[in-house]
C-alpha cells in the first residue's frame, strides 16, 4: 500500500514539473511575439519558397537572415512551421538550427505548434528530429490536444513510440481530461494500449465524465481491447460520474461480444445510472437487437420496475420496431405506464410507449404496439389528438381502427363542449372526414345555448353509445363550437366546415350566431337547401344503424365484415363515399 502511494506521489511530482515547464514556455510566447503584423520581407518570401520547393542550397543562403525566420504570414506560420510539414528532413534541420529556440514552441493562428503540425502531417522522422533537438513533447495545441493524442488519432504506432522514447507524459489530460489511453481505447488499438501500459500508462484514468478507458472500449465495441484492459487491471465495476456502468456503455455500443465478455467477468444488468436507466433501456433505445437478446435474461423485473420505465418505452422512443417485437415476444407489457416522476418531466405528461411512437410519427412502431394490444386511450393527451395535430393520416387511421376514442377531450386544458380532435382538422378535409367517418359526435358541434332565430335553445339528449374501456365520459361544457369557429381569424372556414358536418347529421339546428356568419358565405345556398329539406330515408337508416352498432364495432373491420349485408351496404354504413383518405 505504501509502495503504491510513493509511486503515485512521484508521478504527481513529475507531472507538476512538466506542467511548470509548459506554463513557462507559454508565458514566454506571450511576452516574445515577433513581427507578425509587419509586412513580410523579400528574404522571408524567398526563404519560405525555398522550403516549399525543397531547394536546400538556396535555403542555406536565406537562413542567414535571422529576421526572415522571425516573420509570420497571415496564418501565423513562421518558416519553421513550413519546414516541419515538408518531407525532406534536411530542410527541417537547417531551419531548426537557424531559428531561435523561443520559436520552437510558437503557435500558428490555428493554435498548432511545430511538433503538433509534424505529427498531424504524419512525418515520423520530422517528429524525431524535433524531439532530438530538444523540442518539448507535451505542449498542447489550442484544441487541448497533446502530440501523443494526435499521434494516436492518426493511428501511427511509430510516432507514438517515438514520443514515448522522448519522455512524453502518458497520462497528461487533454480537453475534458481525455487521455492518450482513452483515445487508444476509442480507436481500438490494442498494440498502442500495450505500448502505453508497458511504459506505466494508467488503466484507471477517468475523463471529464468519469469514464475509464475500459468504458470507452466498451462503448466503441472493441472486444479485444476490452479484454486486454480487463486482464491489465481494468475495473469492470467502475461507474462514470452519471452512474453509468461499463456494461451500460457497452449496451450503447451494441457489440454483443462486449456484453457477453463483461457479463462473464461479473458485470450486472441491474445497475442503473443516476437517471435510473439500465443497460437494457440503452440497448433498446439505440436499437441494438443482439445486445438486447443478451440483456433480457440478465435484467430483473424488479430492477426494471424500480427504474420507472420499461424497455418497451425506450424502444418506442428510439423508433426501433425490431427491438419492440423482441421485447413483446419476451413478455414485456405494451401498456406499462411511466412512473409519475418521469411522466411529469414531459410537458404533455405522456405515460405509454404508444405515445412515444405516435409523437415520433413512427407508423411501424405504432402498428407493432397496437397489434400487440396497446391501449390508445391511456395518456392524459390522447394519442389520437397528437396524430391529428401532426396531420398523420395513416397513424390516425390505425389508432381509430384499434379503438382510439375519436370523441376524447384533453382534460388538462379543455374548455369546449365538443370533442377536441376537430380543432386540429379544420384546414384538412381528409382528416376531418376521417374523424367524422369513424364516429365523431358531430351533433355536439351544434350544442349551444344561443338559441335559434326564434329564441329556442337546443338541448341534446345523452348519447346512446356506451363508453369504451379507458374512455373518459367527462365533458366540460364551456365554449360551444359556434363561439370557437366564428372568431375573426377563422370566420372564413365556417361555410366549408358546416357543409361537411351536415353530411353526418339528420337534423341540423343552426343557432342565430352561426347562421348570421353562414349567410354571407358562398356555401350558404347549398347548406340552406340541405337543411330545409328532409333527409333521405337511406341516410336516416344509416345513422340509426351506426348508433345501434356503437363505435367499438364500427371501427373494427372484422366486425363490419361479419354483418349479413351486401358489400355496397357495408360501404354505405361506413361513409365510404366520403372517405377521401381511402380513395
From Swiss-Prot:
GO terms for biological process: intracellular signal transduction; protein ubiquitination. This is Ankyrin repeat and SOCS box protein 15. The lineage of its organism: Eukaryota, Metazoa, Chordata, Craniata, Vertebrata. The SOCS box domain mediates the interaction with the Elongin BC complex, an adapter module in different E3 ubiquitin-protein ligase complexes. It comes from Mus musculus (Mouse). Pfam families: Ank, Ank_2, SOCS_box. Belongs to the ankyrin SOCS box (ASB) family. Keywords: ANK repeat, Repeat, Ubl conjugation pathway. Residues 524-579 form the SOCS box domain. The keyword Repeat applies. Disulfide bonds: none annotated. Pathway: Protein modification; protein ubiquitination. May be a substrate-recognition component of a SCF-like ECS (Elongin-Cullin-SOCS-box protein) E3 ubiquitin-protein ligase complex which mediates the ubiquitination and subsequent proteasomal degradation of target proteins. SMART domains: ANK (SM00248), SOCS (SM00253), SOCS_box (SM00969). ANK repeats lie at residues 75-104, 110-139, 143-172, 176-205, 209-238, 242-271, 275-304, 307-336, 349-378, 379-408, 416-444. InterPro entries: Ankyrin_rpt, Ankyrin_rpt-contain_sf, SOCS_box, SOCS_box-like_dom_sf.
